[in-house]
Amino acid sequence: MIVSTKLQDHFDKITKILSGFGVEGCISYGEITFSIRDQRDIHLILKKLKKEYLFEQLTDVTAVDYLTYGQSDWQVGKVVSQTGFSRGRQQDFKTAAVDNRFEIIYQLLSMANNVRIRVKCKLKDAQIILVDSVSDLWPSANWAEREVYDMFGIYFNNHPDLRRVLTDYGFVGHPLRKDFPQTGYVEMRYDENLGRVVYEPVEIDDRVNTPRVIRN
């Protein structure tokens, strides 16, 4: 792949700034990505990038759950032409332990240097996954981190107001985790007799109607 001289120059300069942290970097599809090995270094590294390479804007914080990464609901092979696909089958979900199941991703922008980078880190598995908040560096991280907490259940240390932001406060679970059922755990409706919204257990079967297919 041909990499522009300007992009390579940015990559080399940032790599030099982060040389003491054992950070791995690459340029792929015209984008710069750096991977942090130790999640305890996230705040320090991002602070260094903001100060020394003028990444004054944090455009996004998100996460990925790799629990079922590489697993296919339908096996695509020669047998398919003989038996076809089985539609609407019951979901056979396995929650096997996965090393470094979650990865957190930060998107940074330096308008002064006209460059964007991605910084990511695989998080150690624990009962409570905790990452240092960067809301003190970029105010925009406040709601973005709340969304990651709400959707993935990742906690942010020193966050000023870590509450759910997309689901209601009594919501059970975290919807973007791969082991969260597509139907959810409860459903809500308005009860005319009670004059309020009530929560009831979901009566819909958890089925795979649109399977994920991984083609080789």
UniProtKB/Swiss-Prot annotation:
UniProt subcellular location: Cell inner membrane
Catalytic activity: a quinone + NADH + 5 H(+)(in) = a quinol + NAD(+) + 4 H(+)(out)
This enzyme's EC code(s): 7.1.1.-
GO terms of molecular function: NADH dehydrogenase (ubiquinone) activity; NADH:ubiquinone reductase (non-electrogenic) activity; quinone binding
SUPFAM superfamilies the UniProt entry points to: Nqo5-like (SSF143243)
GO CC entries: plasma membrane
Translocase recorded as keyword: yes
Enzymatic class: translocase
UniProt entry keywords in alphabetical sequence: Cell inner membrane, Cell membrane, Membrane, NAD, Quinone, Translocase, Transport, Ubiquinone
Top-level taxon of origin: Bacteria
Pfam family, one: Complex1_30kDa
Membrane topology: Peripheral membrane protein
Subunit field text: NDH-1 is composed of 14 different subunits. Subunits NuoB, C, D, E, F, and G constitute the peripheral sector of the complex.
Annotated family: Belongs to the complex I 30 kDa subunit family.
NCBIfam families in the record: NuoC_fam, PRK06074.1-1
Known role: NDH-1 shuttles electrons from NADH, via FMN and iron-sulfur (Fe-S) centers, to quinones in the respiratory chain. The immediate electron acceptor for the enzyme in this species is believed to be ubiquinone. Couples the redox reaction to proton translocation (for every two electrons transferred, four hydrogen ions are translocated across the cytoplasmic membrane), and thus conserves the redox energy in a proton gradient.
Protein name per Swiss-Prot or TrEMBL: NADH-quinone oxidoreductase subunit C
Species of origin: Francisella tularensis subsp. tularensis (strain SCHU S4 / Schu 4)
